Amino acid sequence: MINRLMIATAAVVLTAPLAMAGPIDSACVRSDRGARNAQLCGCIQQVADRTLSRSDQRRAASFFRDPHQAQEVRMSKSNADNAFWARYRNFATTAEAYCAR
């Protein structure tokens, strides 16, 4: 009986996809709004995985802690910040459309 239980447990562990929260999901869940809707945070992370690099995800996640930082990036004259902001806007628009369903 114990062997069957161990085999069943191993099968579940080995075949289940890894449930690793990304930086956007983690920041969202820790935020005031995210604590009430973990499913939405997961959806937003899925969009981030498709539209942002891991580095961009970490940068975007920091906006949950410090929203003013987003404004600083948006208003920046730096080419790198402007390029990031274009990618971030694409991510936000896509997440809004995809996760609103």
Model-identified regions with their sequence ranges:
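Classic N-terminal secretory signal peptides
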Residues: 1-21
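Short, intrinsically disordered, charge-biased short linear motifs at domain edges
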Residues: 11-18, 26-31, 84-88
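Compact alpha-helical subdomains of small soluble proteins
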Residues: 50-101
